């Protein structure tokens, strides 16, 4: 196995591995060689988790120095902050000496947390109370590093770091980055790369470590050349545009023109605040070019014309004996040509020419250990250019240089210069992945690595961190390898393992990964939908793998699974079970069925393991009959197969039916849906029969039933108690049980008719009841019920539980039991009688009720949640995530659109949903279209498809003369996979039981040139048909023009969404969609196609616990404690995921907000700057999360005096918003309000008025005229108009504000009084102005005593206060008198037996909150509005809590 082999050889290859993995500062294969150095990463005692230290410390400070400016303010920084020069780069990550210590006492607090459940926050909080964050820090050690030709370097390191990390530091520093082949020596003793610093003898404070140049080997020489190439290309964005090596783009530095923290405060009169034309309100079609600003100057200076391996390689035998390793060929910028020899001592110029081989050294000879030194010696241009590249490289933020966890692709790219690059060519045609030629054992055994990491111990915190980090690292490498392999399979670069069979039935193995192209060739899915079922099966299987991995049952193994969509095909990549290819399928499977239920097997070990998993996943063990009518017990669906590998592990696969079916999309004879569902058009016959309910829905359904169960039981027990009491004293009974039972019959929800019958008083009463009060009432009812159970007659208590179980539909009569049988509606499956009370009829009803709950409860809940517009989806991706978080499948999108179409206040969401539906329908058509296209026509076919989709102009697809000349025969692998229905079948399952297949759309195959027959009209007719068939929704448009006019869709938004959905990269230029003379898109406009990759995301459980505990503290108003816990979560995330990850970004955003609320705007700016860069690189430049990060950063920039930068950031956020979804969105109103206010502060009143008018228009549309947003917009408009001298308009607008405040807040409220005072001043000014104007009109001349209008610009402080209000932050002033009042109130409410200490503790917490800033008039912060979290939150979409603090 690769892991074991590498473990044996790790010492021998330590230096080489460290240098190999560092050849690119942003290279993916940096973290300790695939499984982090084998020997160390699998040793639980090695504490190797520290080798990937925190780029961002717990207090949000980065290694690049912003936090060094902090002077211990608020003492939130628990570890010393070192200067920038002391930062350590480990595996490409900037290091801090902050590590996670192996402290057992603290680690054990989270030892039992395997899978945090939805209700896990209280437990997390309890754990968090016992966590000492100081224990997670480590002391630093200062050492000096002496390098040849460089000054002595002083570095502060952690004593738990590895020697290898010093290698990474030196390879990242400007002075030493060109060295790769060296060792580190202390007192003439060479240090082990994988030794911890604390284990090194004689290493003390101030010790000097010497860098010693080592002789080259062939491998080291190649590594060095690769590293030099990467240094020269460091500034080139080509790899990011091409989607190579996990590089990606960020433009924050371009927009801010440097680090925000290094900028000085700007005076308002020196700010250039004119917005670009495409940012001003009223833009209908935003341009594309600003998406990539300054793209022409992104590339650094060219240092060499050519650096490549020479054609004279490899050295002949005699030269090998002289020490020659390899030959290089270089062309300098001076146009001089050199042949260079690499030998064990270094590099020198030889006397070879293009025609003559003469390996002897040139005269005069110059030998350099570093190739950079040699090139600098022979080329002055190279020396100057390399110095410039290095300076610009080191000026970039550390986050810009680190590799992302997964590849992020761009949907638009400029024309890229294609240069000579031998290493790129070598990588492209190498059968291995990146650095695998440097790994002992060569090819990696992915399955062994994936399973071995899961078997690592997990009892203590260090063990769990090591385990999760190893899982994440191996998984990331596997995803990268699987993606590359899937693309190679489609491109025809991989030989099938069964080449003699029909191409549709071929299977592939590449790099120890199994690939299947899911054509349903053996009618495996014939009864389930054929190719359509085969296409979706891998996606459902991936869902199953995800949930079983999350449950994480010890001894139960799943396969590494990645699903790749590329060029219209779906490829499933899986790790290979040991021995699976050596046996027939029938011999391999020991559990489940290989023929959909005819032959069913069971296995006691599998039953034991799956029963444990089923408890978490709510899967009901059930008994089915096999073909011999023998009962067989299963704890999963019949399709789930169990195979015991040659390694003795118990594997499960084919998890496509982990969850129960969705009966709303199955036409079943014995199922009668409710009248409400029938009226809505259900059941809808889907094109396949694999539709399943989501796990989120089942959890919500069970939770809803559990609340009903408790309420009914409590009501009945109260009734029994009252009856007993009434026998002694005449008392009125409490409401009877029947009412509670009736209420539960509709899944715990009131019928719509019942809601409409409520009178206004009841509705107001219900609205006024807070969530906390309702929760408290339920808790009290439960407690009372429990006490009643203890005191009541046991028979009566059992009867109460029985009736409550019957009322909510529990499977068991005497116990609350909700589990689901995934096979309950499977065709051909015969069920035996279940356990007592779990009859098949009950199981079917339960599945039906869950599906009904989705339609009648979850869809209304989804829409109600978005009615407040507090977390508005911005594009189809965020809409899909929101639907999934409510357990709603995207196949219900048509029903959601029908409801939204009747709600004008949800117009923006309706438009986004329609756009997403059109994109998905078009994707189905595109996949089939692409499968019928020859490889040499791909560019022409894709551009023709885009013309048909986005334009109504001429679309004459002409095959270019170049392509016609190339055309011959069928031309490539692509056509071998044509399907009669555009799909792909299941291969490995049919022969090995190891794979699910996949399929695409549903049109008939045709000749390779049929794509030329498509027209805009025919495409939109297909889209309409697909929308009706798949989503049961009538798309009322037959062209792009009608879609734009009827639904308000922007063409550019549709193009972006479609390109991202199917993997198209178009040329970065402006497109004229209205062109009537020539097609909008040509062949040259299609730059590339990239894969769409679906995979599971490993979790960091301890970090999740820290995060949720921190959220709980924040909700209690304990900001400092919350800050510490969120910082701890960030530390743990950095240890598990590395520096860049989506969840790290969520932590950074929260830390920045907390810093701002705690009064430290500079710290907030430093942290938020990193959050923006991280979101751009990990999520994408135009991702909804990136827009959110930009708006936050603009606020913090303004608070730090960077007024101009704040405007630029808002302009960027607004441009991205309009590009993605247009101007008609509630979030645009927020951005426009911010822009208007800052322009107002700068005296640009006309521009300010344009933005605030647009914001007011949107706020009126989406919030109504009785909303705080609208009142605030009226007030801002009045302020602007008064400064322009338009007092009449200002007076009218301020009246609107005043009337709202008076009606909603009362006359005595502070806001009402402020508005009244504003009205008085405006009225006074208006009357004075009108009086003077009347005098002018009456006299006909200007009187000399007309006073000038004095317009006092607002102070920056008042503008900041208003910005805070707009963005949902309110600072409430609390005086000492208020604190005394609060003390008396608390004393009244405390119990009489409370001690004085308890009272004082309560007072002290308030005083501490008030003293956060050390001011006489102190402040408690209150976030009055949760910011929209458009992006994915920490750990599977968990919402970040609103940061609220109560002032009492």
From Swiss-Prot:
Comp. bias (Low complexity): 9-26, 41-66, 986-1007
Pfam families membership: CLU, CLU_N, eIF3_p135, GSKIP_dom, TPR_10, TPR_12
Region (Disordered): 1-96, 110-129, 265-286, 726-773, 958-1010, 1414-1448
Feature: compositional bias, Basic residues: 68-77, 966-981
Effect of deleting the gene: Causes mitochondria to cluster within cells.
Coiled-coil ranges from the UniProt annotation: none
CDD domains: CLU-central
Record keyword Glycosyltransferase present: no
Cited PROSITE patterns: CLU
GO cellular component, one term: cytoplasm
Domain Clu, residue spans: 424-666
Positions with biased composition (Polar residues): 78-88
Keywords: Cytoplasm, Phosphoprotein
Family of the protein in this entry: Belongs to the CLU family.
Matching PANTHER family: CLUSTERED MITOCHONDRIA PROTEIN HOMOLOG (PTHR12601:SF6), EUKARYOTIC TRANSLATION INITIATION FACTOR 3 SUBUNIT EIF-3 (PTHR12601)
The protein's name in its UniProt record: Protein clueless
Gene label: clu
